[in-house]
Regions:
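Alpha-helical scaffold segments that mediate packing/assembly in large oligomeric complexes
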Residues: 1-74
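Sequence/fold signature of self-assembling virion shell proteins
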Residues: 42-78, 91-94, 99-212
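Short gly/pro-enriched beta-turn/loop segments at secondary-structure junctions
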Residues: 83-92
Length: 212
C-alpha cells in the first residue's frame, strides 16, 4: 500500500504539470506558458499546443509528430535568436491520455500483428503501430485532452529530483522495546518521500487541449 501510494504521488506531481493553468502548464523562464501556440520566433513561443482530438486514424498524431520534429533548438533566449536554431529532428514515442482515451490510443498504437489476437481494429497503416507507447494518466480528468512526449532518454521534458531515491522510505517502530509497542501495543509506521518535479524543456512536450 505504501509503495503504491509513492507511485501515485510521483504520478500526481508529473500529471499536474500538464493540467495546471487550465491545461497551459506552468509559466517558463522565457515568459511563455509551457504549452502555447505562439511561433518560436516570438519570445516565449513554444508552438506546442493544438486543439485536435486524437481520433481514430493518424491524422492528429501525424500533425503533432511533424510539428515536434520541426521545432527549433534553443540558441539564445534573446531577441534576434528566437527560433533560429536547427530542427530538433525527433518525433514523439509516448502518447499520454486520460483513462477515457486509452482504448482509442491502444487501437492506434498497439503493434498491428497483435491486432487480430486482441480484437483491435487496424485503423490505419503500420506506420506508428508498435512505435508509440500509449499511457493512461490516472490523475487526468478531462476525457478528451491528450499529449505527446519524446522519449525522455533522448530528450527529457520533465525532471524528477529526489533524495534517498524515488521509492518511499518506510520506517517501522515495531520492536517490543519501542515505547509505543511496550505501553500501548502500537506498531507505528512512517513513510517518507522527498521529491521535486519540474519542467526541463518544452521541446519534447506537446499538448492537445480538446474542447468538449
Amino acid at each position: 500500500e505504501a509503495a503504491l501510494a509513492g507511485i501515485r504521488n510521483v504520478s500526481e506531481q508529473v500529471a499536474a504539470i500538464f493540467t495546471q493553468a487550465a491545461g497551459a502548464g506552468p509559466t517558463m523562464n522565457d515568459g511563455g506558458a509551457l504549452f502555447n501556440s505562439t511561433a518560436q520566433t516570438t519570445a516565449g513561443g513554444h508552438i506546442n499546443l493544438l486543439t485536435t482530438a486524437l481520433g481514430t486514424d493518424y491524422t492528429a498524431w501525424n500533425a503533432v509528430a511533424t510539428a515536434m520534429y520541426k521545432k527549433k533548438l534553443m540558441v539564445k533566449n534573446a531577441a534576434g535568436y528566437y527560433g533560429t536554431g536547427k530542427p530538433q529532428g525527433l518525433k514523439p514515442s509516448i502518447c499520454l491520455v486520460p483513462a477515457d482515451l486509452i482504448a482509442a490510443a491502444e487501437a492506434l498504437f498497439v503493434p498491428r500483428w497483435e491486432a487480430p489476437a486482441q480484437n483491435v481494429p487496424a485503423t490505419a497503416s503500420v506506420r506508428w503501430g508498435g512505435r508509440v507507447d500509449p499511457i493512461a494518466v490516472p490523475e487526468w480528468t478531462d476525457a478528451t485532452d491528450w499529449a505527446a512526449v519524446i522519449d525522455p532518454k533522448l530528450r527529457p521534458g520533465v525532471m524528477i529530483g529526489e533524495i534517498f531515491g524515488v521509492v518511499p522510505q518506510i520506517f517501522s517502530a515495531s520492536s517490543e522495546i519501542d515505547p509505543a509497542m511496550f505501553a500501548n501495543d502500537e506498531s507505528r509506521i512512517k513513510v517518507r518521500q522527498f521529491l521535486t518535479v519540474g519542467v526541463a524543456d518544452d521541446l519534447p512536450l506537446h499538448k492537445n487541449n480538446v474542447a468538449g
